[in-house]
Amino acid sequence: LIVRINPSWVLLVPLCIAPILMRVFFDMRVALYIHLTIVIILGNLVPNSFEFIFYQLITGMMSIISVKGFTKRSNFFLVALVIFLTYSMIYTAGILSQNTSWSSLQGDRYLMFLINAVLTLLAYPMIYLFEKLFGMTTDLTLLEISSTNTPALRELARNASGTFQHCMQVANISEDLISEIGGNALLARVGALYHDIGKIK
């Protein structure tokens, strides 16, 4: 539909949402496969297919890599910034490689890249929605409940301070050990933090 209205508006579509969601719920490999599939299919429907595929592949891979380093939900803004900068650098390099004049750069392209990056932030509420709909738990949720400021852990610290300190020590040890063998250190930490939560009563 967008292609029929204005082909250049295809750059407004936040295709990076799909690989971001796949990376958060599954892993990098699934995210990359899904993104490749979407880009190749859409590449056959838009004008300048090679340019479109090149833009989307590079930007999608950068978004997947950026998501890997999540430590909190606010990092979505960092991913959006990475997406904007990647689009902008690819476009700028492509134009300047053909024309030596900076005046050949189109300002509306950068505005499209910015809108695209902002729309990518819709992935945040979508993650929350999918977690609730399908009962899935992501690393982002684990990060939230691993905070010692959660009501359950605060009550444990207040009513059983010795047990709380024990849980903290086990959590730190578990996180280090699981990291060494390449497992999900965050999941191990959360499990260790709450393994004695029953002692609140």
Language-model features: locations:
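Short helix-perturbing small/polar motifs within transmembrane alpha-helices
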Residues: L1-N6, P19-W102
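Hydrophobic alpha-helical scaffolding
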Residues: R4-L11, V30, N48-F52, V67, ...
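Proline-rich intrinsically disordered, low-complexity coils
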Residues: P7, P14, A18-P19, P47, ...
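A generic alpha-helix surface/boundary motif
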Residues: L15-C16, G60, M168-N172
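Acidic/His-rich, divalent-metal-binding segments that scaffold phosphate/diphosphate chemistry
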Residues: H35-T37, V79-G94, G107-K201
